[in-house]
Amino acid sequence: MTQFDFKKLVDAEYLLNNRTNNNIVVIDARGGMLEEGSLMYDKAIVVDWTDISLLGEFGGEELGKLLSKKNYQQIFSKLGITDESEVLVYGFTMPEQGFGDEARVLYTFSYAGFDNVKFIDGGFKQVEKLEFNKKYVPTTDRIDVSDIVRSEATQNEKAIYTDELLSKIGNTDVQIIDTRLEAEYNGRVIYGENKAGHVPGSISLPFNSLVDSNGFLKSRAVLEKYVTDKGLDKNKLQITYCTTGVRASYVAVILEELGFKVLNYEPSFARYANVGEVVLD
């Protein structure tokens, strides 16, 4: 049951009630983590975060950045998104699986000027219960962006990059939020970063701690108390990071809804570990 009153969040019943609505575009954001033959919603298009982001070397400055608005218009055309469309996105059901990819889509499309995007609370486990499923065939069910010549976003007002981040470490008007797992914050390398640890002074706020055991976003009151107890201050700028900016996008979307000013460090810790000081508390 949806507990968080957020206009960008709907339950699976909303998807069911709009099943015959031709203006609805459904995105399965599980992307490359979805194995061939796995169940998916029968009207969905599979999109990976790498399909809608700049590519580059792991640990470089480019990987994880958003694309140009021209690129997103090309992607919208492939997805069948028009000005009349409403996009519904689901991902894996956290906390067991997933990285909050559904909110990464929302974050990305918002930059591109398309705001009529909602993500489905509880993830695919709730969608699956609707019983309108099919088996995933990558060659036909995943978006093909191979013909798009990618270029970098400009004037991305909700992102921050490495040089600016480095200049803000230690700034008392800024709080840096590590959205990775607590184990990663404490020094475990899971996804191949060059160093273990975290950005000096950063606060650990794991992305999947925002959902309950069934994968539903916790209530506004519970989340407000949680982030306050973590020390987050609405009078300060929040900067979120993870490994390549996906989990950080999820937390950024929720924090913004809670009233925080947030920037997402898109190259994230994969890049930072190559150029910045890393600490273990």
What are these regions (language model features)?
Residues M1-A12, N17, F124-P200, E277-D281:
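Active-site neighborhoods of enzymes that stabilize oxyanions during catalysis
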Residues A12-L34:
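Hydrophobic alpha-helical membrane-insertion signals
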Residues N22-I24, D83-E86, T172-V174, P200, ...:
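Loop/turn elements at helix/coil->beta-strand transitions in domains of secreted/extracellular proteins
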Residues L34-Y41:
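Short loop/helix-cap segments at secondary-structure boundaries that form the rim of catalytic
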Residues L54-E86, F207-Q238, G276:
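Helix-loop module immediately N-terminal to the HCX5R catalytic loop
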Residues L63-D163, R247, V251-A270:
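Thiolate-centered catalytic microenvironments shared by cysteine-dependent enzyme domains
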Residues K225, N235-C242, V246, A252, ...:
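C-terminal soluble interaction/assembly domains
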